[in-house]
């Protein structure tokens, strides 16, 4: 289990232990780009102040690439659905 220290953008966050985690299979707009604010807010709503499970599947640019779950639900899939609608 982990906790989120801060959300960096719509597909990346930092845990309280200092690990940067990127959601596998999620390609959110970069900070400052159109729709990025909505993606950031959505990710915050899913993971802030909650216990998360980080299942690492690789490393990219110094970040852990992972499948992330909250209450047994996939954060990755929730973000993918959100971004398709945005």
Predicted features and spans:
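Small beta-barrel nucleic-acid-binding modules, primarily SNase/OB-fold domains
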Residues: 1-86
């Amino acid at each position: 289990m982990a906790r989120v220290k801060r959300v960096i953008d719509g597909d990346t966050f930092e845990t309280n232990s200092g690990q940067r985690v990127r959601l596998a299979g999620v390609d959110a707009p970069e900070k400052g780009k159109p729709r990025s604010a909505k993606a950031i807010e959505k990710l915050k709503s899913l993971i802030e102040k909650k216990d998360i499970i980080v299942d690492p599947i690789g490393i990219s640019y110094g970040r852990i690439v992972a499948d992330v779950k909250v209450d047994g639900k996939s954060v990755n899939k929730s973000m993918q659905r959100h971004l398709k609608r945005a």
